[in-house]
Amino acid sequence: MGADGIGLGELAPELALPDTSGRITTLPMPGEAAATVVAWTCNHCPYALAWHDRLTAAAREYADRGVRFLAVNSNDAQRYPADSPEAMAARYDDAEWGMPYLHDETQGVARAFGARTTPDLFVFDSDLSLRYRGAPDADHQDPAQGAAWLRSALEALLAGREPEPAETEPVGCSIKWRS
């Protein structure tokens, strides 16, 4: 998927970001979660908004199976006020989302992971090794897709298998990088 960021089989970079309440959230320690999904998203991108319900449904459904989800917004809030921490907090509902919504103000975490779009999903196994990277499913306009690629990756990992496909092209709005 490119020279920057991490590739399949590589360990997750460090992540310590504030959530919508200001509390710092980190990745689980190896072995603490059956799998971890780090999903780049935002408040204004039509692709991210179209996939939102599918991602949050998966987060709620897989929580009881030990899967941890984190949503990250790395957009430049100066140029895109809809993605400011205040706007993120106004949109966020923990019960509905099923995951924390994190603000990557410096964009350092997005760069370390190699995130490019909203959405852009990184699915890690229990040892925090990247096992799936890409889109939630094949069509942001078709809710019936139900985040099929994401769910397939999680089912494979929970069964001790490698996801197939392991990579799909992330489709969405580009991350709005700082100048």
Language-model region placement:
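Chalcogenol-based redox active-site neighborhoods
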Residues: 1-158, 163-167, 174
